[in-house]
Amino acid sequence: MSLKVIPCTLTKNQEVFKCVSAQLQYRRGEEEHGSGPIIHRWRPNGHTVAVACANNTVIYYDKKGNVIDALNPTGKLIDIAWDKEGDVLAIAVANTGTIYLWDVNSRNTDTVESGATSSKELPTCLAWSPSTPTLVIGNNAGNIVVYNHRTSRRIAVMGKHQRSVTQITVTPEDYVISCSDDNTLSVTTLEGTTVSTTTTNGEPTNMDYGSVNGKGGSGVTMVSVVIGKKILMLAHYNALDEPVNLQFQEKYGNIHSYRWFNDGYILIGFDRGYIISISAHNNEIGSELVSFLEYRGYLASIAVSTSFNKLLTIGDNMVKVRDLDELTTVTMLTEIETEKNLSEIEVTEDGQLVAVSSQSGVLSIFVTKMPTLAASYNNSICYLTNLTQVTVVAEVEKKGSSTLELNIEPTVMGLGPLNLAVANNNTVFFYDYHTPAQMQAAQQLQSTQSAAEKPTIVAAEPINRVEYLSTVTNIQLNYMYAAVNFGSRLRLHRIRNSEDNVSIEFPEANRNATLYSYALTENFLIFTTSNNYIVYFSLSEWAIVSEYRHVVPVRSIFPHPTNVVCCCFDDRLEAMIYSAVDDEVFRLPSVGSSAHYKGAIWETFTIDKNTFAVFDSQNIYVFLLSKQHIQGESVIYVSATRLPHAYVPLSLNKGIVTCLMSNGKLSSVLLDSHKTESVISDKSETVIDDILTRSLLMHRWSTAWKICIHSNDGSHWNQFAMAALLDSDVGMAIKIFREIGDAAMVTALELIETIEEKNLLHAQIYTILSRYDDAEQLYLESSRPMEALNMRRDLLEWPKALVLAETMNPKEIPYLSKEYAQELELTGDHANSLANYEKGVMENPQNLPELQEHNEICQSGIARMAIKTGDLRRGVQLAKQLEGRVVKRDCAIILEQMKQYTEAAQLYEVGLFYDRAAAVCLKANAWAKVGELLDHVKSPKIHIQYGKIMEKEKKYKVAVKCYETGRDYDNQVRLLLDPLNDPDEAVRVVRESRSIEGAKLVAKFFVKLGDYNSAIQFLVMSQCVQEAFELAEKNNAVREYAKAIEQHGNISQALELAEYYNRVNDMFMAAKFYTQAGQYNNAINLLFKNGDDENCVALAVDCGIKSKDKTLNNKLVKFLLGEDGNVKDPAQLFRLYVGLGRTKDAAQTAVVVAQIHQAKGNYRIARDLLFQMHQQLREKMMRIPLDMNKSLMAIHSYIIVKALINRKETLLAARLLIRTCGEIQRFPTHVVPILTSSVVICTQANLKKSAHKFAAQLMTPEYRPKIHEKYKKKIEDIVRKGGNQKDLVEENTPCPICDDLMPAYAMSCDNCKSLVPYCILTGRHIVASDFSRCPHCEMPGFYSEFRKLSILNENCYMCGGDLKGAIPEDAKAYLEKMEQDYK
C-alpha cells in the first residue's frame, strides 16, 4: 500500500503543511469480532495482538492479520492482560469468578478464582506485575486477589475498598494501586500491607503512575488519577493523603485520557479535542508547557511510544502522530474513512505497529515505523517500503522504481546490477528485478502516471533459494556471484543454480583466522581477517591474487566499484585508502573523529570517479583520490556536508548522496563540494574564495577559470595556477600565467611542456615551485639524474651538490669544491674553505686556459685562507708566486687587518698598489719607504700625511710639494708665505685653488706690506667682506672692492654695495650691483635715468635678459625703441631679443640693423652682423628665420665676388653678380657700380644676354648720369648691339636632398620643394658628393673649394678662419639639422 500525502492543519497557528500517512497493515471487523466494543492488547516485545471480541471470543492475530489461535470462554469478556514475558494472556469474564490464563505458546489454558471469600465475588479488572509473574485481580466486593503464576500461590487481600474495584495496576516495585467506585484510592503491597490510602471528592478513573526524578537523580513513583473527569490528582505513592489536584481551563472540556512520558511529564487529552503537556516536577508541577487543539470533533484516545518518541492520538476518524520533542508538528496523519466512532489506540513497544479500534468492533493495524533496511549497488538502491515489499530504484537519478512483493519479512538485503537478495534467518531468496515482464509492466504504468508517483508493484518469484548453516548477516551481489556472510563464515557462489555450481568459503581452514569484513566487486571478492590481512580473491582466476598484511585488523572495507583500491577502517580507528596494485596505504587527512566513522561511499559518476565520501552520524566528509597529483597517488580532503539527523548514506552520484531516512524512505543530500553557482556576480569575496577552493580541489578547471575571470584577483589566479601545476596540468598552468601576464613563468613552463617522462616532469615542476628536495628525489629516479646535480649547483647548495657529484660525476668535484670554498670564505669558515680550495686544484699538463683560470682562483683562495688560518709564510709566498695583482691585494688587506704591516706593504708594492703600500708604511712609521713610493702614489691623503711629517722635519720644500700634490692648499700657502717667503707663488696658488683660508693668509700678508688693493681682493675671496669694505673705504679703494665683489661676492654683499653706490649717486655702479643682487626693477629704474650712456643701455639689456620678467622687458623694449625721444642703438635691441629667446624679433632686428649698414654702404659690417646673429641663434638651438638667412646669402654673395674675380673665377663672379642684381634694392648706395660691374663681368663670362639686360638698366634716366665715363661708351655699345644674344646655359647639379637635377645657383629644389644650403665660397647650392664645412664657423661648402683655398693659404670667406682642417662630411646629417633649424 502506497503512502498518501495529506494536507494537515496545525490549529495553534493555522500553519498548513504536508505529512505522510501510516500504512494500513490489515483490518478486521464485525465479521470476525462481532458488533460492539473490543479490547486489544499487544504482546510484549512482539508484533502480535490479542483481541477480546464483542462475540465473547479472544482472537490472537499475527503480524499480517492471520489468526494464530482463538479462545471461546463462556461469558462476556471484560478485560485481558499479558504477563511481562508475553507468554500468558489473562482473561476476565463477566458473571463468573474464574480468570482464564491462556498460554499462547503451549495453547493450554489454566484458571484462577477471582473471589476473595466466595465464588459470588466477580472480577472487575486485572493487571500483571511489570517485574514478576504476578497477576492482581480486583472484584466487585472491593477485594483484591494476588496470584503468583510461577508458584501458583494465591493471596486474598480484603477490605481495601467498600465497593467494586474499578481499576487496578502494579508498579515496577510491586506496589498495587487500586481505586473503587466508593471514591477511595489505595496503595498496597503484594502481601496485602496498606502503604497509603485516601478518599477523593469524586469518582476516581484513569488511574496510572509515573516516575519523577527527585533530588540526587533517584526516581520517585507518583500516582495519578482523574477525579470527576475534571481534576487530575497527583500524589506520592506513600502519601496519597497529600495530593496535588490540578484543574484545567473550562474550554478544554473533560479529561478523557492521559499518559506519562519522558520522566515526569504528562500528556492530557480532553474530550473537546485539546491536548496539553504538563510537568509533575515539584518546581513546576501543573505548569502547562504545550497546548493545542488536536481535533475539532472529539478525541477518543492517546498513546505514547517512548522507543518511537511519538505521541499517537485518535479522534475525528483520524490517527495523528507527533514527535514528543516537537509537539507542535504533526509528523503523520491517517484518515480512517471506514469507521466513525474510534475508541482506543495502542502501540507496540518498538513503535512499529499501532492498533486502532472502534465502537463497532473494527480493529485496524497500521505500520507507523518501517524497519530501516536498505542496500545499494553503485547508483541503484533497494529499500523496504512495507514489511514484505522491497522497492528497487535501478538508477537513482532517473527517478524510476519497481516494487517487489515478497513472501517473507526480510531482515537482510543485498542488491546487484540485475538481482535482489533478501534473507530471513538462515535462508536467502534471490530475485530478478530486471525481467522483461517487469519492464513491460513498468512501461504500461508509466504511460498513464509517473513512476515517481507510484512505483511498479510486482509479485516476485525467487529465482533461487539457498539455506546456510546459521543466520545470514550480510549479502553482496554482482552480475554473477553472491557473497553471503553467516556467522563467522563467508560463502561465494553463483546467484543462479548451474551445472558446475561452484562455491567457496572464506576464511580458508589453513588461514587460522576469523572473518572481519568483506566486499564484492565485479572482479574481486575482498575480505579482511582477524590476523590483519586484506585478501583479494579474483573471480576470473578463481584464486587469491593479492594479500596485504596490515598492522592491525581491518574492521570494514569499502572498495572502489571499478578500481583495485578500497577505503578501510581498522581497529586503531584510523581510516585509509589501500591500493592492491602496489600495496600502498594512504591515510585519510584527519577530519572529524575517525572513531565515529560509519562507512564510505564512492562516486559512481565517471568524471568524478575518484571522489569518495566517509560519513558519521552528523557529517559527510568528501575526499579525492588524486592519481595525477605531483606527489603521486594521495588523498585530498575536499569539504564536509552536514548530514540530517538519522540519515544513512547509501550511494553517491554526481555529488548527490542518496540516504535512507529513519522512516524507511529515501532522501538526497547535495554535497557542498559539488554545489555549482551559475551566478557569482552577487557573491561575497568569502563565498567566491570558497567556491574557487572547492572547484580546484575537485579539478573543475572551467569553473575555476570563470571565477578568476570574474574576480580578476591575482591571488585567485596564482591559486589556480598552483593547483594546475600540482596536478601536472602544465598546459592549463601556461594558459593561466599567460592570462595574468607572467611571461617568465610561461617561458619556464613551455620549456617543460613537452616532457613525457612523469618523474622528470614532476621534478621540473617541483623546481619551479621551489620544492627542491622533492625535485632532487624525482630527478634521481628519472632518466636524467644529472639534473639533480645541476639544480643544486644552480641553487648554490654546494654541500648537497658535492654529495651528488661523488656518486654521479666525480669530475665535477673540483669545480664544486671551488664554489663551496668561496661560500665558506664569505661565511668565515676559513679552515674548511682552505680544504675545499685545495680539493679544487686540478692538474693541467696541457696548460688549458680554462683550467689555468680555475687553478688560479683556487690557489688565490689557498693563499688567502692560509694567511687567515695563521700560515703567513705559505700565504705570502704563494701570493708572490701567482701572476695576478688581485691576489696580492687581497692577501695584503688580510695582513693589514692582522697588523702585519711589513708583509702587507711588500705584497701591495709587488702588486703595484702603491697608495696602499704607502699607507701601510705610514702605519709602520717607515718614512724612508714612503719617500721611495711617493712618486707612484696618487692618494692626496697620503701626500698630505707625508707632507706633515716632512714639515716636522723642517723639509719645507718637500712638504710644500706634498701639500700641492695632496691639494692641501691652505698648508701650502702657509708654508709659501712663512717660512719660504714666496708670496708670488702663494698668490698663484690661492687664485687657482680659491682657498678661503689661503686667501686670508695672503690678505694678511699684503696688509702687512701695505698693498691694500691686493689685500681687499683676497679678503673678499676669504669671505671677510666687512673687513675688506672697511679697508677699501679707509684707503679710497672701493672700486677694487667692487671688482672683488663682482667676482667672488654673494647676493647680500652685492646688494649692500649697490645701496652704497646709490647713496653716493653712482647710478651705473648701483644698477650693476642691483642686477647682480637680483633687484632688476631697481637697476632698470636707475639705468633709465642715464639713457644717453651707452654703457647704461648695455647694462639695462643685460639686466632685462637676466630678469626674465615680461613686464620689465616690455618696458625695456619701449625704452630701446626711443620712448624717451632718444632712439637707442638697434644692436642693443637685437641683443635683448637674442637673450630672451625671441627669435623672430631678434631676426627682424638684425635685418633692420643690417639694412642700416647697407644703406650706408657698410656691406661687410651688415654681413658680419647677420652672420653673428646666425651663429648665436644656432648656438642657442633656436630657429633661424628665412628672411635673415636670405639677407645673409645676398650680401655674402656680393662680398665674395671680388675674391672670385681675383682668382680668375669669372663665370662664378658673373653668376653671383646676377644674383646680386636680383636683390639690388639691398644695395641702394651702390646700384650703379654694381650694375656696371655686372655688365663688365657678364660680358667677360660670355653672358651676353645678362650683360645687355644690366646695360639697358643703366641707360635709364635715373642711373645714366651716374655711370663712370670709363664704362659709358662700352655700355652704350652693348645696349645698341645686344638684344638677340644668349647666355651660357647654367649647369645643373643634383639636389643633395632628393638627388634630382636643379640649376647650380638655385637655392630651392622644384622637385622636393626643399630649401638647399649654399656654398660660402662659390655661392652655388651644395651637393652631397662634395660636401664639407668650415672648421671654425661650420658653414657649408664644396670640399674641393675648401681644399683649393687651403692650398692657396686663403681663409674662410665668411668667418676668416683657417681652412686647413676641412674634411669631407656627410651632407645628409647636416641637412637633417638644417631642416629643423630653417623651419
Swiss-Prot record:
Pfam families: Beta-prop_WDR19_1st, Beta-prop_WDR19_2nd, TPR_IF140-IFT172, TPR_IFT80_172
Subcellular location: Cell projection, Cilium
UniProt cross-references to PROSITE patterns, sorted A to Z: WD_REPEATS_REGION
Tissue/organ expression: Expressed in ciliated sensory neurons.
Cellular component, GO annotation: cilium; intraciliary transport particle A; intraciliary transport particle B; non-motile cilium
Cited InterPro entries: TPR-like_helical_dom_sf (IPR011990), TPR_IF140/IFT172/WDR19 (IPR056168), TPR_IFT80_172_dom (IPR056157), WD40/YVTN_repeat-like_dom_sf (IPR015943), WD40_repeat_dom_sf (IPR036322), WD40_rpt (IPR001680), WDR19/dyf-2 (IPR040379), WDR19_WD40_rpt (IPR039468)
Disruption phenotype: Defects in cilium morphology and mislocalization of intraflagellar transport proteins. Specifically, phasmid cilia are shorter compared to wild-type, ciliary IFT A complex proteins such as che-11, osm-5 are mislocalized, and the transport and accumulation of the ciliary IFT B complex protein che-13 is impaired. Mutants also display a strong osmosensory (osm) phenotype with an aversion to high osmolarity, and they exhibit impaired chemotaxis in response to volatile odorants such as pyrazine and iso-amyl alcohol.
Keyword entries, A-Z: Cell projection, Cilium, Cilium biogenesis/degradation, Protein transport, Repeat, TPR repeat, Transport, WD repeat
GO biological process, one term: chemosensory behavior
Quaternary structure and interacting proteins, as annotated: Component of the IFT complex A (IFT-A) composed of at least che-11, daf-10, dyf-2, ift-139, ift-43 and ifta-1.
UniProt name for this protein: WD repeat-containing protein dyf-2
